[in-house]
Amino acid sequence: MPEPIQIAEEKMKKAIETLKEEFATVRAGRANPHILDKVMVDYYGVPTPIPQLASITVPEARMIVIQPWEARMLKEIEKAIQKADLGVNPANDGKVIRLIFPELTEERRKELVKQVKKMAEDAKVAIRNIRREAIDEYKKMKKNNEITEDDLKDAEEDVQKLHDKYIEQIEKLLSAKEKEIMEV
């Protein structure tokens, strides 16, 4: 059976991956094709992400071009983008859909920073909860005489070090994302 610290590390890695995915959906000053990863289109009755239905290119810093592999999907993709409320209106020319991203206002940038700070805080809370679960698991093992008091202290220290490492990663990711958003 895996150690509680191994389980905790796996969960912490997942929390970081989730945060990275969330950050990717937050639009900074330039067009990011990942903004479309979670936009679902009805494809023969199955909700399908846009990247699986079309080629996506970024010909300019503030433009994304979506070229569906099936022409009939053009309207469906356009509808899905409008419904997703990405803060951009799709322009459909009959062959491709162009998304032109407006310059971000100072106010919008500050809103986005607030949004990513909340995402980072949620990730930190998740990391803290994982730390607590792991320590509780070790305490249970101590109570059942599976480990000694010294083992418990060592385990608590190791879990704390792991916690600190992942909290630091969150701080670095947040700092980089804030910088990206505030870049004009």
From Swiss-Prot:
Coiled coil: none annotated. CDD domains: RRF. It comes from the Bacteria. GO terms for biological process: translational termination. GO terms for cellular component: cytoplasm. It is found in: Cytoplasm. Keywords: Cytoplasm, Protein biosynthesis. The keyword Nucleus does not apply. GO terms for molecular function: ribosomal large subunit binding. SUPFAM superfamilies: Ribosome recycling factor, RRF. The keyword Cytoplasm applies. Responsible for the release of ribosomes from messenger RNA at the termination of protein biosynthesis. May increase the efficiency of translation by recycling ribosomes from one round of translation to another. Belongs to the RRF family. This is Ribosome-recycling factor. It comes from Caldicellulosiruptor saccharolyticus (strain ATCC 43494 / DSM 8903 / Tp8T 6331). The lineage of its organism: Bacteria, Bacillati, Bacillota, Bacillota incertae sedis, Caldicellulosiruptorales.
